[in-house]
């Protein structure tokens, strides 16, 4: 794709905004949910809210993998971290996610063996470097990450490694969107669909949105122009009544996605119900290792029982934020007891979390309150 000059970008933005204003009915409120944490950050960074008509409201959804990871999962991870014979391998943004009583960063400060890795395949190096230890990898993430972790599971299996285990809590995006619509707690007029996830799954898994719910949607890239283009696409669907799964990210996202990655996921995992933070159990929204790979499933190979109940942080409204029911600034803890330096909830921990984005980018010009 040709790289646009600054002037060309400005001209394109002007054209898109004129189109959006023409498609939006004055006085009408349209609530669009961006389902990807990267979109949330881009919307703030590029100041898109300030450019759109006042009636177009952008709300954040359950698009941050760290944020939607259930509290019980974190408590299990911490329980494994307490074992002397165990090394936890994890992505760095999991360190500060609060469990019921502690966090991985706090456990690490007390002597727990926790290694931050940048690619799942690093667990193989850890396995060989520490053959006397059990390596437990925190396998979280949406479809984008799942494909890479599948390759790691297969590599561990083929290498015959006996000390690598996966604590799995993968999440699938389409079932979560269905649950949000079924609950009908918050009015959603359209979805800005995630780009990276859609590279893997394609357009077809979102087909239920127009077919069953009559909800317009559009797959979007990640810069401001691509997001504006998706918003214009959704508004045009509403205007014409031709409700479809739009795709303004054609250069990357194919209709059927990545069949190789999909086949690998089907080979390694079975679909299962899974718990989402603040939302609860969503049917068919998770993955579990197939029986063929049960020896690498931490919960089956290294069973653990929690001796205390899992508790959400008192007062934290992360679950309501993830469902688009409230803005982060409407949580009573936001900017007070819950800040980027001292996060109470998972939505403030991850760089893709809605609360973290609001906190970083959402200051008003006065610097003391957050813009709504």
Which stretches of residues belong to each language-model region?
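Flexible, glycine/charged-enriched surface loops at secondary-structure junctions
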Residues: 27-32, 163-164, 240-250, 276, ...
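Short hydrophobic/aromatic-enriched beta-strand-loop microsegments
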Residues: 57-60, 114, 159-166, 188-191, ...
């Amino acid at each position: 794709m040709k790289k646009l000059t600054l002037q060309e970008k400005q001209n394109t933005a002007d054209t898109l905004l004129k189109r959006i204003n023409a498609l939006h009915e004055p006085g009408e409120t349209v609530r669009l949910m961006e389902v990807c944490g990267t979109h949330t950050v881009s919307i703030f960074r590029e100041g898109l809210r300030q450019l759109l008509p006042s009636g177009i409201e952008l709300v954040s959804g359950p698009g941050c993998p760290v944020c939607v990871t259930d509290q019980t999962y974190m408590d299990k991870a911490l329980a494994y971290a307490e074992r002397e014979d165990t090394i936890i391998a994890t992505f760095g943004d999991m360190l500060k996610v609060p469990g019921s009583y502690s966090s991985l960063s706090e456990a690490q400060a007390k002597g727990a063996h926790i290694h931050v890795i940048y690619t799942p395949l690093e667990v193989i190096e850890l396995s060989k470097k520490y053959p006397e230890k059990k390596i437990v990898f925190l396998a979280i993430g949406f479809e984008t990450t799942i494909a890479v972790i599948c390759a790691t599971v297969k590599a561990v299996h083929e290498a015959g490694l006996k000390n690598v285990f996966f604590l799995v809590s993968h999440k699938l995006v389409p079932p979560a969107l269905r649950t949000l619509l079924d609950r009908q707690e918050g009015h959603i007029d359209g979805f800005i669909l995630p780009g990276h996830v859609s590279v893997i799954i394609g357009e077809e898994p979102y087909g239920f949105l127009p077919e069953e719910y009559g909800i317009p949607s559009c797959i979007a890239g990640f810069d401001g122009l691509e997001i504006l283009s998706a918003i214009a696409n959704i508004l045009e669907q509403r205007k014409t009544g031709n409700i479809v799964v739009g795709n303004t990210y054609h250069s990357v996202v194919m209709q059927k996605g990545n069949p190789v990655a999909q086949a690998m996921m089907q080979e390694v995992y079975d679909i299962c119900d899974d718990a989402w933070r603040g939302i609860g159990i969503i049917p068919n929204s998770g993955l579990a290792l197939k029986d063929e790979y049960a020896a690498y499933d931490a919960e089956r190979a290294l069973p653990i029982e929690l001796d205390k109940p899992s508790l959400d942080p008192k007062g934290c409204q992360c679950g309501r934020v993830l469902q688009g029911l409230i803005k982060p600034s409407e949580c009573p803890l936001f900017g007070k007891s819950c800040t980027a330096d001292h996060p109470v909830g998972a939505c403030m921990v991850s760089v893709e979390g809605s609360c973290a984005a609001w906190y970083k980018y959402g200051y008003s010009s006065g610097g003391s309150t957050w813009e709504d």
